[in-house]
């Protein structure tokens, strides 16, 4: 987290007060860091007029005041305390004093849960290009719950849940009917939107090299260097959102307008020894729609054993293809 201070110095951090006080004492080499002129100057702050102390520094350790990430990083550089220890004491983060509060579990693990979050954002989700909030929409409660559970596990926050009013696809704008208390309240056949604060979107885009900015999506090259658990979660989530399983056609098929994105997923599948066919396309609403297909029982079996689906419907169809 401290590594992000150059870009997100304005993030406000709620950190264990006792620990922060000890950190400040260590940085100032003074039992009263809020009175230490050298520390006050180093942090680019000013003392109270005609006084020899800084009320803001005092407030960080005595008045439940959040501390800007930029200031916390500067304090850390004055001490020998490892960044991992400091991050373990962080309680919550906000993008500014009034942003939505999130409670990440540091260090953020590169695992299947994070891979699934990224995969769903690349699929039926997004990170708003202007306001940076994370959004995921689906009609499948299983996928909605998976995304919500993983976000809570990684970032310690529950979503704002809205049910979408039925509209004519591609002709009418999305309209939100009402806010829900639980995904279980979603009415059959309707879509549900999960909304999360900008803090998460900013962190994810920083980690994954601006992989999702509005409708512009990509997979950074370093993904191939990450562990298989992450890749498995990434592929599964994307196939749950964008893939189909056909009993009659005897194939698994992945659709996407973004040709480059499909090429990356074809290559990622090879790491699980699943071989997909070449990219093809068809024209829909005067626009190219790209796809590739997976055939053959040995590929179906490998996909089932190594990747699978969260969607019960797709998983059952895949079982039929194997049998």
Question: Where are the predicted features?
Answer:
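Internal intein/HINT superfamily modules and their associated LAGLIDADG
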Residues: 1-323
């Amino acid at each position: 987290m401290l590594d992000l201070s150059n870009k997100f110095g304005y993030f406000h951090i709620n950190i264990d007060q006792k620990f922060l006080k000890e950190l400040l004492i260590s940085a100032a080499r003074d039992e009263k860091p809020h009175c230490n002129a050298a520390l006050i100057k180093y942090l680019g702050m000013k003392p109270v007029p005609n006084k020899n102390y800084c009320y803001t520094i005092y407030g960080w350790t005595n008045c439940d005041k959040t501390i800007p990430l930029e200031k916390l990083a500067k304090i850390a550089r004055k001490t020998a305390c490892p960044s991992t220890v400091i991050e373990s004491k962080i309680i919550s983060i906000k993008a500014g004093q009034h942003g939505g509060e999130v409670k990440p579990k540091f260090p953020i693990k590169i695992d299947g849960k994070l891979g699934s979050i990224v995969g769903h954002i690349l699929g039926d989700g997004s990170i708003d290009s202007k306001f940076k909030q994370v959004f995921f929409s689906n009609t499948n409660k299983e996928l909605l719950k998976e995304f919500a559970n993983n976000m809570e596990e990684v970032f310690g926050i529950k979503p704002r849940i809205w049910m979408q009013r039925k509209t004519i696809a591609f002709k009418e704008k999305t309209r939100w009917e009402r806010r829900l208390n639980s995904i279980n309240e979603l009415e059959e056949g309707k879509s549900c939107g999960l909304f999360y604060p900008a803090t998460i979107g900013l962190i994810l885009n920083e980690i994954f090299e601006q992989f999702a900015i509005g409708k512009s999506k990509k997979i950074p090259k370093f993904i191939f260097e990450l562990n298989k658990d992450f890749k498995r979660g990434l592929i599964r989530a994307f196939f749950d959102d964008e893939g189909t399983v056909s009993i009659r056609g005897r194939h698994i098929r992945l659709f996407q307008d973004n040709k480059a994105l499909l090429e990356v997923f074809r290559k990622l599948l090879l790491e699980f020894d699943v071989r997909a066919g070449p990219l093809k396309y068809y024209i829909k609403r005067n626009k190219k729609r790209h796809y590739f297909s997976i055939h053959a029982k040995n590929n179906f079996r490998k996909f089932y054993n190594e990747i699978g689906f969260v969607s019960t419907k797709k998983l059952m169809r895949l079982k039929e293809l194997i049998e």
